[in-house]
Design a protein with these regions (language model features):
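C-terminal helical subdomain
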Residues: 2-12, 19-60
Length: 60
């Protein structure tokens, strides 16, 4: 199984935090890891090969 992940946003870290006036404006590394794990564990009857991860506040 091959999967393609698009990480479209900054990743929160101890050295790089989000502004106080923009909560949830950066991706949480633990949430990214959980998304990878979920793809690994997905059932074969509902298969994906691409997943895009963006912060909640991003406008389309």
């Amino acid at each position: 199984h091959v999967a393609h992940f698009v990480i479209d946003g900054g990743i929160r870290s101890a050295a790089r935090t989000e502004p106080a006036d923009k909560p949830d404006s950066m991706l949480d590394p633990d949430a990214i890891a959980l998304s990878y794990w979920n793809v690994l564990q997905q059932p074969r009857s509902a298969w994906t090969w691409e997943l895009e991860l963006r912060p909640w506040v991003e406008k389309f």
